[in-house]
Design a protein with these regions (language model features):
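Mid-domain catalytic core of redox enzymes
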Residues: 109-229
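C-terminal catalytic lobe of FAD-dependent flavoproteins
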Residues: 209-256
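Active-site/ligand-binding neighborhood in enzyme catalytic cores
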Residues: 2-121, 129-132
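A short, flexible beta-alpha/helix-coil linker loop
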Residues: 77, 203, 243-245
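Conserved beta-strand scaffold positions in the cores of enzyme catalytic domains, especially
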Residues: 102, 122, 195-197, 235-238
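Conserved beta-strand termini and adjacent loop/short-helix elements that scaffold enzyme active sites
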Residues: 105-107, 177, 239
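Aromatic-acidic/polar surface patches that form glycan- and anion
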Residues: 19, 82-89, 163-164, 246-253
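Surface-exposed flexible segments
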Residues: 62-69, 136, 248-256
Length: 256
């Protein structure tokens, strides 16, 4: 393959040969979008490593679309304007919280009565099953663990994020943080060292931080029951991964 059109033709041929009209699982959904070669080289191993499950056992709706570009554009998003806050998100949040009381290492559920009395409305961003003390059982989540190290070199991988799509490599990706701001400090000077973080995906266990929900029929049914309980308590679902049990940016609002 030497031209973008040749690559496009092969992908379309593979999709046509598979003839998957109604994908029953994630594997069939991916095959129907990008064909077998791209799926097996870039999607299958990474996805099974991320979710800890065979692609055939994951629902099709997890992959709504797979952006395929036959160019050197390696951005995932298509927005015309993209960026991150100067100094990073920590600095942005610090500025947002200026003048606001912040309590760290405080569990809302363990101090619920006291904290509820502080405001007319409380935004709860924890797991919905934890809110109800796991009365109906545990929802399943995936968790993420980071191993971070400082290297005595100016450049490790030359890019902010590199995904490892094979199943054998234990981490899903390596983040080299300096490249989010072009490898320079706040004065525009080159940084002589670099910090990297290896990201590992794992099954969530109580006491760990839940990162994203495992969307399958069993969990969907259990979440529906928790959601019904929340509605009876006049809890309005908003947009946080755990609170509304969806892989989105979310929040959970309780109206008193």
């Amino acid at each position: 393959i030497v031209t973008p059109q040749e690559a496009k033709d092969i992908i379309q041929l593979q999709i046509a040969d598979l003839n998957i009209t109604e994908p029953k699982n994630l594997e069939e959904q991916a095959l129907s979008l990008v064909g077998r070669d791209v799926y097996e080289k870039l999607i299958k191993g990474y996805t099974e490593k991320q979710w800890g499950r065979d692609c055939k056992d994951l629902p099709a709706f997890i992959i709504k679309r797979l952006p395929v570009r036959l160019t050197f554009d390696n951005n995932y998003f298509n927005a015309l304007y993209q960026g991150i806050p100067m100094g990073g998100y920590t600095k942005m949040v610090e500025n947002l919280l200026e003048g606001i009381e912040v309590r760290l290492n405080t569990d809302y559920l363990e101090n619920k009565k006291e904290l509820d009395a502080l405001a007319k409305k409380v935004v709860y961003t924890g797991p919905i099953d934890a809110y109800f003390d796991y009365e109906l059982g545990y929802l399943e989540y995936r968790s993420v663990r980071f191993e971070t190290e400082t290297l005595d070199k100016p450049n490790f991988q030359g890019n902010a994020a590199v995904n490892y799509t094979d199943k054998e490599t234990p981490w899903t990706r390596i983040i080299e943080h300096k490249w989010f701001e072009f490898g320079k400090d706040e004065n525009g000077e080159e940084l002589p060292k670099t910090i990297i973080s290896r990201e590992y995906s794992s099954e969530w266990k109580p006491g760990e931080e839940p990162y994203y929900p495992v969307n399958n029929e069993k969990n969907a049914a259990l979440y529906a029951r928790y959601k019904e309980m929340a509605e009876k308590e006049n809890i309005i679902t908003g947009s946080v991964h755990a609170a509304i049990y969806e892989f989105v940016s979310s929040a959970f609002l309780k109206d008193f």
